[in-house]
Amino acid sequence: MSDNIGKVVQVMGPVVDVEFEPGKLPAILTALLITNTVINDEADNLVVEVAQHLGDNVVRTIAMDVTDGLVRGMPVKDTGAPITMPVGAASLGRVLNVVGKPVDGLGPVSREKTMPIHRPAPLFTEQDTSVNVLETGIKVIDLLVPFPRGGKMGLFGGAGVGKTVIMMEMVNNIAMQHGGISVFAGVGERTREGNDLYHEMKDSGVLPKAALIYGQMTEPPGARARVALSALTCAEYFRDVEGQDVLIFIDNIFRFTQAGAEVSALLGRIPSAVGYQPTLAVDLGGLQERITSTDKGSITAVQCVYVPADDLTDPAPATTFAHLDGTVVLSRQIAELGIYPSVDPLDSTSRILDAAYIGEEHYRVAREVQQTLQKYKELQDIIAILGMDELSDEDKVTVERARKLQRFLSQPFHVAEVFTGKPGSYVKIEDTVRSFKEICDGKHDDLPESAFYMVGSIEEAVAKAKG
């Protein structure tokens, strides 16, 4: 830490102006420390980040915590470095905030290894261009919305359709099957949800393989605009230094953009369309471009995307779409049928649902499943008005198979065992493809629909029917 000391000259909400001696201005993105007794009794407990040089030896900074209690003339220490996060084993099983301080009440976190949160994206020469499928063990995702290793997937869904459970199951499967690390970034989410997630992960035993980095709705915009970068830094350490395949969950990526918009006007920038910051694309790009596969390891991202007023043309979701490799859409109609995970098989898309990446057989089966379900959807109006008896024999077979496929897309989850009483199942991709192929080929037309509900592989369905 340098011995450069400045003083507070102006406070405007989350934005603080600090004056330094001539020739001693800290660089942009440098972390400065102020002691704010309103937060707690610790020294240097408020971190502010340099955003602009205003002239007259004054820098404009964004606060990472509340600025209530700051007064003009307060001393400000220059750390000479950006905000840093504790990385490696120290971050696992813990809940940290944007500046790497623990918020779980379990004592201090070792800062033996730290990394700055602002880092360049990997160079083109370091990036891995081969496309590999990341097996999640969740049938509907592996079959119809395959995740590219090192890719970015968007998870779209309203409240109560199962986003969190799918996330937790993925954390569990990556930890159990791949021995992988997961990082969860809670960006501007409800504190209650963050608390629930922590306790559920603790109870299901996946917490030791995960790092939770939270910046909830109550935090100032500075923290919410940086917490995704803090979490990504933890993930990058596991990828670049330990050569791991890491999964990062960001809930919610919209709040990252929203926080940037909140501080943008205070920094004197002219707002862009719909009041967003003019730097929207570059802010989001700086985060998204760091999420990639390199020759050392990979970071695969699952991002929850809130769509304001269901308007997909809003600049925030529209800019996010440009970065995504695929979208998993969760449907309330499917959840109402009791089918979980409630992924909409006709609305969800993946860039790598292509024979060149997943193989001819997988591609053919996936498309056949979608065609059967689409035909069933088209026939539903006729069935509702005239009943099943008016359908042709061919259509009756299609409807019966579609209903079996629909039920077979459900699956018992490990993390939901406590609620359902059913043991969870992890299904390998080859078993998933084979199972769905057998249903499409009519091999199991004699089994009742109920046999396909909440089972793993097709063998479990056959055993359930014999039951």
From Swiss-Prot:
Q: What is its main location?
A: membrane
Q: What is its EC number?
A: 7.1.2.2
Topology with regard to the membrane?
Answer: Peripheral membrane protein
Q: According to the UniProt record, what class of enzyme is this?
A: translocase
Please give the SUPFAM superfamilies that the UniProt record associates with this protein: C-terminal domain of alpha and beta subunits of F1 ATP synthase (SSF47917), N-terminal domain of alpha and beta subunits of F1 ATP synthase (SSF50615), P-loop containing nucleoside triphosphate hydrolases (SSF52540)
Give the binding site residues for ATP.
G157, G158, A159, G160, V161, G162, K163, T164
Give me the disulphide-bonded residues: none
Question: Any idea what job this protein has?
Answer: Produces ATP from ADP in the presence of a proton gradient across the membrane. The catalytic sites are hosted primarily by the beta subunits.
Which NCBIfam families does this chain map to?
atpD (TIGR01039)
The record's similarity note reads: Belongs to the ATPase alpha/beta chains family.
Record-given protein name: ATP synthase subunit beta
Organism equals Desulfosudis oleivorans (strain DSM 6200 / JCM 39069 / Hxd3)
